[in-house]
Amino acid sequence: MQPWRRKFPLFETGVTMKQRKNSNLSIFVVVFSVFLFGIFMYNEDVKSIAEFPFSTSKPHDVHDEATPITEITTLPVQESIKNSDPIQESIKNADSVQDSVKDVAEPVQEEVSKTEEVKKIELFAATEDEEDVELPPEECDLFTGEWVFDNETHPLYKEDQCEFLTAQVTCMRNGRRDSLYQNWRWQPRDCSLPKFKAKLLLEKLRNKRMMFVGDSLNRNQWESMVCLVQSVVPPGRKSLNKTGSLSVFRVEDYNATVEFYWAPFLVESNSDDPNMHSILNRIIMPESIEKHGVNWKGVDFLVFNTYIWWMNTFAMKVLRGSFDKGDTEYEEIERPVAYRRVMRTWGDWVERNIDPLRTTVFFASMSPLHIKSLDWENPDGIKCALETTPILNMSMPFSVGTDYRLFSVAENVTHSLNVPVYFLNITKLSEYRKDAHTSVHTIRQGKMLTPEQQADPNTYADCIHWCLPGLPDTWNEFLYTRIISRS
C-alpha cells in the first residue's frame, strides 16, 4: 500500500477504524498541519495558530517551522492518530474544522492585504533619491543673488500634476502659451539653496502643523507649498478641506497639515469674510487681533504676511469702536502709521502666545506689483501682459511702486521682538519677475476671463498674483531651507 501517492479530499465526512481510512486520515492531518504552520510562518502575528486543535506540538515547542513538521511526518500513521486526541475529535466534525480554518485564514489574508498596502505606500514615497542635502552656511544671505535659467531642475512640480491648484493660478491651463516663467531658479550670490526634497520636508512636518496667515498672496504661497509636498504622497492619502477662514491640506501618513488662514490685515477688518471680501471701503481695527489669533495657537510653523490690501488707498480707515457693537464711524490715518500700529499689535500677540521652543515664526515681506511697463523701460508693454522674461540687468535701478515704508516697519518690528521671527525678504528678488504674474490667464470674481477680456490686458491683467508653478515656489524654498536647517 502506498497511501502517500493517493489523493484524498481535504475533509472526510466519516471515519472508521479500518487501516486504509486511518492512513488517509493521518495523511490529511500531516498535510493540514503543514498548511497551518505555513500560514503561521507567513504571518507571525497570528499567534492563535499555536493553540489550534490541529497542532500536535505544544505552544512552548514551536520554535521554527522544521520542528513540528518533522515530528508529524516521522511518526507511524497509527501512532500519529493515537497520540493526537484533539485531532481525532475534530475530524469527527468536518464542518467544525472548515469553520476553524476559515476563522484563521481570513484574518491572515486581511493582515497580508494591509501589509501589502503599507508596502505600496512606502514604495510610492521612496521614489526620491537618498543623497545628502547640502545646507548653506548660517551666515549666507539667501536673498541677494540673481535669477538663473534652469529647465533641468525647475519647475519643481508640474501644473497638471497638482490637483489642488485653483483656477486663479493655473496659467497654462488658462491659455498661457509660453512656459519659460517656470524655469527660473534663484541663485544666491555667496551660496546655493539646497535641493528641494518633499520627503525631507514632510519628515520635518511629521505630527506638526504649518499655517500661512494673511492675504491672497500668502494663499498663493500656500497653494505652492501644497503642490510641493503633495507630489510624493500617494492618491487617497491626502485631502483638502475648507471651513470658513481656514483651509487645511492634510497628509495622512505623516499626520501633517499645511494650512491657510484668511486675515488680510492680520487684525480685525470688514474684509475678513473669506468669500465676500471685495470691499473698496476697507476699515480696520488695528488693536484687535484676538479673534484671529485664537486660530493660530498651537501651530508649529507660522508664516505671516500683510501688504496688498493696504495699497488701494493712501490713507487707512480705522474704526472708532467695534464691529461687534455695530459701530461705523472711523478716522483716516496715513498708511505707514496704521501699518505700524497693526504690526505692533501682531508683535505683542507673538510675544504673549508663541513658545519659541515649539513654534517657528516667519514674516514674509511685500510681494510687488508690476503695473506700469515703463518701470522696467518697456514703452510698448501693457502692464505685465506679454512679459516672458525677468528683468535680467540686476544693476539697473528701477522701481515698481513698492511701498518700502511698510517694508521698513515690518523689518524693524520683526527684528525687535524677544521671540525669534525669521524675516523672509522676498521683495527685491520678486521685483525682477515681471514675467511671472497671472496677467490675463486667470479668473476674476470667480469666473474665467472671456476671450474679449483677455484681449484687453490694460483693464483685466492681474499683475498682483503669480502663476504656479512659479515665483512662490522660490519663496517656499527659503522656508524649506530654514526649516531643514534648524530642526
From Swiss-Prot:
Induction entry: Not induced during cold acclimation.
Effect of residue 214 to E: In esk1-2; increased freezing tolerance
Entry membrane topology: Single-pass type II membrane protein
Effect of residue 259 to K: In esk1-3; increased freezing tolerance
Residues listed as glycosylation sites in the UniProt record: 151, 241, 255, 393, 412, 425
Motif position, DXXH motif: 462-465
Superkingdom: Eukaryota
InterPro entries: TBL (IPR029962), TBL_C (IPR026057), TBL_N (IPR025846)
Alphabetical GO biological process terms: positive regulation of DNA-templated transcription; response to cold; response to freezing; xylan biosynthetic process
Cytoplasmic side: 1-21
Tissue expression remark: Expressed in roots, young seedlings, leaves, stems, flowers and developing siliques. Specifically expressed in secondary wall-forming cells, xylem and interfascicular fibers.
Motif range (GDS motif): 214-216
Modification sites for O-acetylserine: 216
Disulfide bonds: 140-191, 162-227, 171-467, 384-463
Result of changing residue 215 to A: Almost abolishes transferase activity
Enzyme class (EC, first level): transferase
GO terms for cellular component: Golgi apparatus; Golgi membrane
Keywords from the named record: Acetylation, Disulfide bond, Glycoprotein, Golgi apparatus, Membrane, Signal-anchor, Transferase, Transmembrane, Transmembrane helix
Residue ranges annotated as Lumenal topological domain: 43-487
Keyword Disulfide bond on entry: yes
Function: Xylan acetyltransferase required for 2-O- and 3-O-monoacetylation of xylosyl residues in xylan. Catalyzes the 2-O-acetylation of xylan, followed by nonenzymatic acetyl migration to the O-3 position, resulting in products that are monoacetylated at both O-2 and O-3 positions. Is necessary for the formation of the functional xylem, which is required for water transport to aerial tissues. Acts as a negative regulator of cold acclimation. Involved in water economy as well as salt tolerance. Regulated at the transcriptional level by NAC012/SND1.
Protein name per the record: Xylan O-acetyltransferase 1
Organism encoding this protein: Arabidopsis thaliana
Originating gene: ESK1
